[in-house]
Amino acid sequence: MRENIGNLINFAIRAGKYALGESALNDARKGKAKLVLIAKDTSDSNKKRWIDKFTYCKVPCEIYGTKEELGFLLHKDAIAVLSINEAHIAREIKKLIKEEELNGIQKE
């Protein structure tokens, strides 16, 4: 996980602007969630289920990090779904993820 993205996620966590799992979905339904991170090692069927639910709520989703990496940020074992509930932080995280994807494509 890239350090800058981890720092932004930590900032959202310290500010209390995050939710996990079903709570993230509840926040999405209430219009609070601005971005959802789904761990890349989540099973394909669960990824599809989460993406469908968040897409229905009009919340962008990114596949990023592993369950353990996301869990580490919250001092938990593993986290599959994390919502960022602050627009500016979500925008910056999304921008950095896109840059990381572009850099990965250029290296291949």
Predicted regions and their residues:
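Mid-chain, well-packed structural core segment of small domains
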Residues: K53-V81
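C-terminal structural segments of small proteins and small subunits
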Residues: G71-E108
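N-terminal positively charged helical leader segments and presequences
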Residues: K30-D52, V59-P60
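Fold-independent oxyanion-binding glycine-rich loops
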Residues: E22, K40-D41, I84-N85
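N-terminal first-folded block
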Residues: N4-I38
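Short, ordered loop/turn segments at secondary-structure junctions
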Residues: D41-T42, T66-E69, A87
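Glycine-rich nucleotide phosphate-binding loop and flanking beta-alpha elements
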Residues: N26, S43-D44, H88-A90
